Amino acid sequence: MATESTATAAIAAELVSADKVEDAPAPSTSADKMESLDVDSEAKKLLGLGQKHLVMGDIPAAVNAFQEAASLLGKKYGETANECGEAFFFYGKSLLELARMENGVLGNALEGVHVEEEEGEKTEDESLVENNDNVDEEAREELREQVYDAMGEKEAKKAEGQSLTKPETDKEQESEVEKGGREDMDISEPAEKLQEKVESTSKQLTESSEEAKEAAIPGLNEDEVTSGKTEQESLCTEEGKSISGVYVQNKEFREAVPQEEGEEMISLEKKPKETSEDQTIGAPEKQDTLMKVVEIEAEIDSEVKSVDVGGEEPKDQGAISESELGKAVLMQLSGQDVEVSPVVAAEAGSEVSEKPGQEITVLPNNGPVVGQSSAGDQTPSEPQNSAERLSETKDGASVEEVKAELVPEQEEAMPPVEESEAAGDGVETKVAQRATEKAPEDKFKIAANEETQERDEQMKEGEETEGSEEEDKENDKAEETTNESVLEKKTLQENEEEEIGNLELAWDMLDLAKIIFKRQETKEAQLYAAQAHLKLGEVSVESENYIQAVEEFQACLSLQEQYLEAHDRLLAETHYQLGLAYGYNSQYDEAVAQFGKSIDVIEKRMAVLLEQMKEAEGSFTEYEKEIEELKELLPEIREKIEDAKESQRSGNVAELALKATLVESSTSGFTPSGAGASVSMIASRKPTDGASSSNCVTDISHLVRKKRKPEEESPRKDDAKKAKPEPEVNGGSGDAVSSGNEVSENMEAEAENQAESQTTAEGTVDSAATVKSTAC
């Protein structure tokens, strides 16, 4: 059942589809016909418009019109269709004219280009530039103010960025301070809370001072320490000072707190100075010595601080040496009245060594606060300046300056140690000496470590920067090469596109039109083919391919002779173009012949027109106009004939001159011909004038003798040796020796004559000339 149902469903579907197909209307061809008619009519309109532009001299517009017509017909009928031949022919003809216009140096090459508009745009641009130059003074001042404001904002931003930047050591110190919980105090809190916090911090200081006292000097009493601390606190409270435990850096704190509150920063370096001053008020006799000690101690503290900021390991050693040194000096000089100062120094040294760069701020209750009390302000300004100078070295001075300042300060610190040795306190002085000896060594080690670390960092940064620079250079080179390759490809493509110029495109279009027209047997098509050959010849002339041009003109002439009369002007044009091609190809005889044939055709045409004028009735304006045109052509053609004849003559003369120069260059062997002539002259003169020639030879022999003396001596000796034994061999006696000597002399004279004759025969032209002069 299922199969039957599916089969019935399929049959029903087929029937429905068949009904639909039958009901569907048949496609109408009216739309296609309308489109074809529209294309043909549009192409004809474009062809007419192009011919109009061509006659009017608007070559670019004609090219566009013919191109559009050819594209329309080519899409509809195909490129090789008969309907496209005329469009391709005119398109190629217009392209040829456009190429001539572009290649013409003296022609109107700018025709069709809107030069006036470009000049107007240039004048507008120039006017804009002049307006910028003619700006008012007020506007200039406003611009200057804006520029200065922008520059000031940039400088302010730079200053803020520099102030906010911190070194790594300061960041580490701040982290340690935050861990210790000493930055909990707020500046905006009231004075009572600040005093409470000051009391708590003072208690902590007392506890730390007691511990330091027990560790450093077990013999001191706790009452003295506490009394010294209470006195210090009372002095601070009486003067209205509140010491905060906030430890911040100078620059950061000055930025955070406004200057209107009038606060001052008092560093830990001045703390032992204040305590020593307050405690030495009752002892005026030892004030000077104590001030020197305090100055030395403050300088050492600041130096330790400036050195400990860079390094981390030797902090404890610097603190111990500092505390012991202060303890020993103050115990020996000030006695029991100043026993608290070493403890304070120890506290200050320990705190400085543990947390360098931290300071104690003094906040007023009502108004600004002075750094020290008026009653106890007895210290001179020099220690303060020195301390401030050394504290400044902590921020920006180099390690070398600190080293230079350590040496005189150590020398100043040595006399109190020597006095302590004289007093008998040997143990403490030895400890102080060891501390003072170890401290500078540690400081120098720290400085050396800092220098090495800085150098390593600089080297690493330099290597990284060099590596990055090299990578950047390589990347830049790779990008440049890729860009250059892309540009080269683009330029090659553009050059290839540009190489397909108007002449080549015109050749293609005309060749295609020639093929289309030659395929047709009608007279009109064959004449179009002849015109295509003519234009192809002109394209060849423009591209300086004269042989191809001659072939194309001959093909055109053969077709025209078949279908045209003998007096047709097209024949005259073809003969003229063929004569030009022969002339360009240096075939002047053929050129003159073709120009003559062109004149004959024109004369025939004029005769025919005159006959038609006689036979015709009515106006003769058309005939007269054409006759005038033909008469104007004749002088030009005759001038071409004269030019061809003259060029033929000049060409013959040039050929003769060239042949003459070639012959002269080939036959002008200067040295061989001159030598031969001189030798012949010498040979002819020798038999006639023997005496003079012999005299001349003797004159030259003196010269040759001087030049070739070592070469001529050996043959003379050999000849003499050979001549001497001859009489003895022949059985001669002693008288024969004299005769042999005479014979040898004669032999030598003959040998000399032979050598001189050989030299004269083998001499150059110059030697021959000298022979002639000496002989005369």
From Swiss-Prot:
Q: Name one GO molecular function term.
A: histone chaperone activity
Sequence positions bearing Phosphoserine:
127, 175, 188, 242, 306, 321, 386, 398, 468, 485, 650, 693-694, 714, 733, 739, 744
What spans are recorded as compositionally biased (Acidic residues)?
A: 116-140, 408-422, 463-473
Q: Which residues carry this modification: Phosphothreonine?
A: 123, 169, 379, 452, 465, 482, 671
**Positions bearing N6-acetyllysine:** 33, 241, 251, 286
Say yes or no: keyword Protein transport present. Answer: yes
Q: Where is this region: Disordered?
A: 115-241, 256-289, 345-497, 685-776
Compositional bias of kind Basic and acidic residues: 141-160, 167-200, 267-276, 389-406, 435-445, 474-493, 709-727
Q: Which InterPro entries match?
A: NASP-like, Tetratricopeptide_SHNi-TPR_dom, TPR-like_helical_dom_sf, TPR_rpt
Task: Name the Gene Ontology biological process terms.
Answer: blastocyst development; CENP-A containing chromatin assembly; DNA replication; DNA replication-dependent chromatin assembly; G1/S transition of mitotic cell cycle; male gonad development; nucleosome assembly; protein transport
Q: What does this protein do?
A: Component of the histone chaperone network. Binds and stabilizes histone H3-H4 not bound to chromatin to maintain a soluble reservoir and modulate degradation by chaperone-mediated autophagy. Required for DNA replication, normal cell cycle progression and cell proliferation. Forms a cytoplasmic complex with HSP90 and H1 linker histones and stimulates HSP90 ATPase activity. NASP and H1 histone are subsequently released from the complex and translocate to the nucleus where the histone is released for binding to DNA.
PANTHER family attached here?
NUCLEAR AUTOANTIGENIC SPERM PROTEIN, NUCLEAR AUTOANTIGENIC SPERM PROTEIN NASP -RELATED
**What family is reported?**
Belongs to the NASP family.
- The protein, known as: Nuclear autoantigenic sperm protein
Species name for this entry?
Answer: Rattus norvegicus (Rat)
| Taxonomic path | Eukaryota, Metazoa, Chordata, Craniata, Vertebrata
The gene is Nasp
